[in-house]
Amino acid sequence: MLMPKRTKFRKQMKGRNRGKSFRGNSLAFGDIGIKATEHGRIDSRQIEAARIAMTRHIKRAGKIWIRVFPDKPLTAKPLETRMGKGKGSVDKWVMNIQPGRIVYEMAGIEEELAREALALAQSKLPFKTKIVTSESENEIY
């Protein structure tokens, strides 16, 4: 599972997930990728599940780049615990996703196979996405 090696503080406040993505919103490594079209939050398990689905479909051919990293701790209190007594312990690591963010990129395989693999990955993600290529990338969200 993806998570930071160390952080300055163990726990963070929730914050707000607003606006559009101004960084990481264009294909940088591959020829085809997945772009988020709405706000959401992705955790390390979802990133890994989508990666495994893509890798199995392309039978380890080509190359996959993961363009997101979960660096925000999400806390949870144990089940059947009364409120109070402080903030819960870190449960999982997440990343806030804004519209326009590239999540995965692929290269080195034919486009039809890549589209099938990316469609499998799209079903594992908790927000709406679209498949973009280097030609279709300049379209509005």
From Swiss-Prot:
It comes from the Bacteria. PANTHER family: 50S/60S RIBOSOMAL PROTEIN L16, LARGE RIBOSOMAL SUBUNIT PROTEIN UL16M. GO terms for molecular function: rRNA binding; structural constituent of ribosome; tRNA binding. Pfam families: Ribosomal_L16. Keywords: Ribonucleoprotein, Ribosomal protein, RNA-binding, rRNA-binding, tRNA-binding. Residues 1-22 are annotated as: Disordered. GO terms for cellular component: cytosolic large ribosomal subunit. Binds 23S rRNA and is also seen to make contacts with the A and possibly P site tRNAs. Residues 1-21 have a biased composition (Basic residues). Gene3D superfamilies: Ribosomal protein L10e/L16. One of its GO terms (biological process) is translation. Belongs to the universal ribosomal protein uL16 family. Part of the 50S ribosomal subunit. This is Large ribosomal subunit protein uL16. It comes from Wolinella succinogenes (strain ATCC 29543 / DSM 1740 / CCUG 13145 / JCM 31913 / LMG 7466 / NCTC 11488 / FDC 602W) (Vibrio succinogenes).
